[in-house]
């Protein structure tokens, strides 16, 4: 079962259906809206979800995903690209996959998989076989991974700026967001109004979905580290 949270869960659903064509052990795939998961209580093999869905600016509370996992006696796989490093308790999942960008603040281009138990299924694809990656049978994205070297040394300071901007934005404009606090990710915020700016150094996030409002990504002051005060928010115009 895949939880529908937006564009990135749509992509997971597409990938799952593509895999179903090649692997007969995948019998069925359900796609359930995020606000209906409390109604699910039957046995499942896997639950797949985005922890933070940047296309809609929302987060699924990890505690609720854990309850769903236990209730359905299932394993949990998380797309953690936008949550890794910023949100907590990723260890609740059996498998997480994430990128070098978004939550890790790095360049795009590298992908990572973390899991509790080694997979037992046989994979014919050379690239998708984890053993080939473990054995370094192909060239890795070393330039991207190298970009993380200094980032991780200063990660707490970068994360501090995200939190400063998130807290300040919610204090000023939280009333425009349809999501309660428990659904608010640290990385971004959705508001039901359009946001513009004339400040040339501010780059607004463009979600992959057409939304009536805007998703604001809180990375605008990461370069300031501990000096961040959320002043870039004064450059925004709420329409």
Which functions belong to the PLM regions below?
Residues 1-9:
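Conserved PLP-anchoring active-site segment centered on the Schiff-base-forming lysine
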Residues 11-21:
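Active-site-proximal loop->helix
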Residues 31-80, 84:
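Active-site phosphate-binding strand-loop segment of PLP-dependent enzymes
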Residues 90-101:
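Conserved active-site segment immediately N-terminal to the catalytic lysine
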Residues 101-171:
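Active-site C-terminal subdomain of aminotransferase-like
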Residues 152-184, 192-199:
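Conserved PLP-dependent catalytic core of the aminotransferase class-I/II
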Residues 177-239:
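Conserved C-terminal alpha-helix-loop-beta "cap" of PLP-dependent enzymes
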């Amino acid at each position: 079962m895949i939880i529908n949270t937006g564009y990135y869960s749509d992509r997971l659903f597409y990938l799952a259906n593509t895999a179903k064509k090649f692997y007969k052990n995948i019998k069925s795939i359900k796609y359930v809206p995020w606000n209906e998961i409390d109604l699910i209580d039957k046995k499942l093999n896997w639950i797949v979800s985005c922890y933070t869905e940047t296309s809609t600016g929302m987060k699924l509370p990890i505690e609720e995903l854990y309850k769903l996992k236990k209730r359905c006696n299932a394993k949990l796989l998380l797309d953690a690209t936008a949550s890794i490093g910023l949100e907590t308790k990723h260890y609740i999942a059996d498998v997480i996959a994430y990128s070098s960008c978004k939550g890790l603040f790095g360049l795009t281009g590298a992908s990572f998989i973390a899991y509790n138990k080694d997979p037992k299924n046989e994979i014919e694809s050379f690239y998708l076989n984890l053993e080939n990656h473990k054995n370094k049978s192909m060239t890795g994205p070393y330039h991207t991974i190298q970009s993380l070297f200094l980032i991780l040394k200063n990660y707490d300071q970068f994360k501090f700026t995200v939190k400063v901007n998130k807290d300040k934005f919610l204090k000023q404009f939280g009333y425009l967001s349809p999501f309660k606090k428990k659904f608010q990710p640290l990385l971004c915020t959705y508001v039901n109004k359009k946001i513009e700016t004339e400040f040339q150094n501010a780059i607004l996030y463009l979600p992959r979905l057409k939304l009536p409002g805007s998703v604001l990504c809180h990375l605008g002051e990461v370069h300031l580290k501990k000096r961040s005060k959320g002043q870039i928010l004064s450059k925004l115009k709420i329409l």
